[in-house]
Regions:
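Short, well-ordered alpha-helices that flank and scaffold nucleotide-derived cofactor binding pockets
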Residues: 2-3, 78
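Post-Walker A helix-loop "phosphate-sensing" segment adjacent to the P-loop in P-loop NTPases
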Residues: 3-12
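Conserved structural-core and active-site-/substrate-pathway-adjacent residues in large, well-folded domains
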Residues: 1, 46, 123-126
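PAPS-dependent sulfotransferase catalytic domain
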Residues: 15, 19-35, 55-168
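Core active-site phosphate/anionic-ligand binding loop and the adjoining beta-turn-alpha structural block
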Residues: 42
């Protein structure tokens, strides 16, 4: 996707976490009650954070690739209510084993991958959060199965671009 002229990808930077911290609103009830002005301020804060990493124009489509953003879907939806979500998934066994075997720098999120049982629990909770948010917010989601991408890269990429309203 990053090779598309209209797409800018953000490679696993804690942008959303920084925005959430700056907004100082960490309950779903607070963010769901945002006024138009508060939402606009949150969007401006997000764009300001992005500009620390990449140059963007008004026509840029931004894809934030941090996998753990799945845990912040309520914030994402309330900051960008018409935003599109691409959920890239692998077979659960592959995703869990791969995460557990990674040598991540230890922080509060990565601590979930230090034990296999904890990694399984974290994966399950993440998927439950996604399912709940998809139903609660009627999210506009495209699910990309990693195995399908490997089998037919061009077809799966065209599907994603179509979902985003972009040409191949």
């Amino acid at each position: 996707l990053s090779s598309h002229s209209k797409i800018i990808t953000i490679e696993e930077k804690p942008i959303l976490q920084s925005v959430i911290k700056q907004l100082d609103q960490d309950s779903i009830e607070e963010i769901e009650g945002w006024s138009t002005l508060e939402r606009s301020q949150a969007q401006s804060c997000y764009l300001k954070e992005i500009k620390k990493y990449v140059e963007i124009s008004s026509s840029s489509m931004i894809i934030d690739k941090l996998p753990l953003n799945i845990l912040n879907l309520p914030f994402i939806h309330n900051i960008f209510p018409s935003g599109k979500i691409i959920l890239a998934i692998r077979h659960p066994f592959d995703a869990i084993l791969s995460s557990w075997m990674q040598n991540f720098s230890l922080n509060s999120a990565m601590a979930n991958f230090t034990e296999l049982k904890r990694t399984v629990q974290f994966y399950c909770i993440s998927m439950e959060i996604f399912d709940h948010c998809e139903k609660r917010y009627d999210l506009d989601v495209h699910i990309l199965k990693y195995e399908n991408l490997l089998d037919n890269f061009e077809l799966e990429t065209k599907k994603m671009l179509s979902f985003l309203g972009l040409d191949w």
